[in-house]
Amino acid sequence: MRPAFAVGLVFAGCCSNVIFLELLARTHPGCGNIVTFAQFLFIAVEGFLFEANLGRKPPAIPIRYYAIMVTMFFTVSVVNNYALNLNIAMPLHMIFRSGSLIANMILGIIILKKRYSMFKYTSIALVSAGIFICTFMSAKQVTVQTGLSDKDGFQAFAWWLLGIAALTFALLMSARMGIFQETLYRQFGKHSKEALFYNHALPLPGFIFLASDIYDHVVLFNKSELYQVPVIGVTMPVMWFYLLMNVVTQYVCIRGVFILTTECTSLTVTLVVTLRKFVSLIFSILYFQNQFTMWHWLGTSFVFIGTLMYTEVWKNLGTTKSELQKDDKKD
């Protein structure tokens, strides 16, 4: 029952989170900083109350290691959200971030000296090809935007290239953070809830450098049209409602993934998260009518098929950790 409940949380939380993020970004493309700050603040407060026990519970992993992890996590979060302000459409944003396997493999080979089977190299080639196709076709769409002069068109394309560079940087940084986490957990044991709290609490002072931008968007949000929240009947600016729902659904998504990791194998978790991304992508295309050609569909299929090939989820689908433990006892 718990795995099914967790899957429901992941799909409901993560998919709706993407919807509210796109609603925010479509109205104010530069709102990434205030969105990131709100998410970090909410999760930090929740963790301070329930995980850190109001600061009375000492961390299992030394703070100096969290400081390194937090620097990377903060950078990745800010850069990923800011990329939406650089002519990056939400579908491309989701597809590009789905390429984390490539970055993980590359850095795993370089840093951890890992070696992989030819099957996994093939799957990574599929993912790479899919991302390249989607990126290339998106580049063509940027260059042929209607209503833009040659100068404005070139400027839009230049900003788009900067957005691609930002996403690439965030992808590699995220993979490096994953490797760092792997080494920490190997040394100190897994403390995912604790890591979640410190990863969101420690970076909060860093938002001081983004205070001006955050304040500007607070003003913009206050000026948005009023919206009456269903059921409770409270009236508030619609942008604040979108932000509130984005933060809440982000938390639901994270909690769902956490429950899933305690109940199922990592491969099953990967499958659920991958399918969730695919559903979010489809919804974004259909509901928001984002441009998506047959080439985009081909690239998307390459990305998701390659991801499923890499994880070999069909061999472990539905296997819970308790079942694995039973099998171990039999052996």
UniProtKB/Swiss-Prot annotation:
Segments carrying motif Mediates endoplasmic reticulum retention: 326-331
Catalytic activity, reaction form: UDP-N-acetyl-alpha-D-glucosamine(in) + UDP-alpha-D-glucuronate(out) = UDP-N-acetyl-alpha-D-glucosamine(out) + UDP-alpha-D-glucuronate(in); UDP-alpha-D-xylose(in) + UDP-alpha-D-glucuronate(out) = UDP-alpha-D-xylose(out) + UDP-alpha-D-glucuronate(in)
Keywords: Endoplasmic reticulum, Membrane, Sugar transport, Transmembrane, Transmembrane helix, Transport
Database matches in InterPro entries: SCL35B1-4/HUT1 (IPR013657)
GO biological process, one term: regulation of gluconeogenesis
Keyword Heme listed: no
Cell compartments where the protein resides: Endoplasmic reticulum membrane
Membrane protein topology class: Multi-pass membrane protein
Pfam families: UAA (PF08449)
Keyword Hydrolase applies: no
GO CC term (a single one): endoplasmic reticulum membrane
GO molecular function ontology, one term from the record: UDP-xylose transmembrane transporter activity
TM ranges: 4-24, 30-50, 59-79, 92-112, 124-144, 153-173, 201-221, 229-249, 251-267, 268-288, 294-314
Protein task: Antiporter that transports nucleotide sugars across the endoplasmic reticulum (ER) membrane in exchange for another nucleotide sugar. May couple UDP-alpha-D-glucuronate (UDP-GlcA) or UDP-alpha-D-xylose (UDP-Xyl) efflux to UDP-alpha-D-glucuronate (UDP-GlcA) influx into the ER lumen, which in turn stimulates glucuronidation and excretion of endobiotics and xenobiotics.
Assigned protein family: Belongs to the nucleotide-sugar transporter family. SLC35B subfamily.
Protein name: Nucleotide sugar transporter SLC35B4
